[in-house]
């Protein structure tokens, strides 16, 4: 199980969620804590760099958010991130600096490290994607196996 430890999987300096990730050994231990972490961190973000755009939604002033994107909090969208047309952020989402959440991509209870790309027709649920990860079109990650049993 050594290879599954957070310290062996991720470059922690590439996420605003570093403190949360350092509090656990395995990635799945972090998932139930994302919501509270966002709310706590969001209230501490530099107001010169981030705007609060709704209840528990903080968006970096340099981020680009399409007018057709839907963002439900809690959520933090990092500097220079791009939230494209019809992206659906269901809540409990940390989107890293320079990340791309694309057309018709849905996020729920996730941490996307800096420069992650989920550019089109993706579903990312209950997941952590590391620095510079890229998901191809139509890819799905979630906590349900194809046989519908919990992972």
Regions found by a protein language model. Give the residues of each.
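Terminal amphipathic alpha-helical/low-complexity segments used for targeting or macromolecular assembly
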Residues: 1-56, 61
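Periodic glycine anchor positions in long extracellular repeat architectures
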Residues: 60-63, 78
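Flexible, glycine/small-residue-enriched loop-and-beta-strand segment within the central core
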Residues: 42, 71-77, 82-151
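LRR N-terminal entry segment and analogous cap-like coil->beta motifs
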Residues: 64-68
């Amino acid at each position: 199980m050594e290879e599954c430890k957070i310290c062996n999987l991720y470059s922690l300096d590439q996420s605003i969620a570093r403190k949360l990730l350092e509090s656990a050994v395995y990635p799945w231990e972090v998932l139930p804590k994302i919501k509270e972490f966002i709310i706590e961190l969001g209230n501490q973000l530099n107001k010169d760099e981030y705007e609060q755009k709704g209840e528990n939604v903080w968006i970096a002033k340099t981020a680009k958010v399409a007018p057709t994107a839907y963002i439900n909090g809690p959520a933090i969208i990092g500097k220079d991130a791009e939230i494209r047309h019809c992206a659906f952020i269901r809540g409990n989402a940390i989107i890293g600096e320079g990340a791309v959440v694309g057309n018709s991509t849905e996020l729920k209870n996730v941490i996307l490290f800096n420069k992650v790309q989920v550019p089109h027709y993706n579903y990312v649920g209950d997941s952590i994607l590391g620095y510079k990860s890229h998901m191809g079109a139509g890819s799905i990650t979630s906590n349900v196996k194809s046989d519908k049993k919990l992972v």
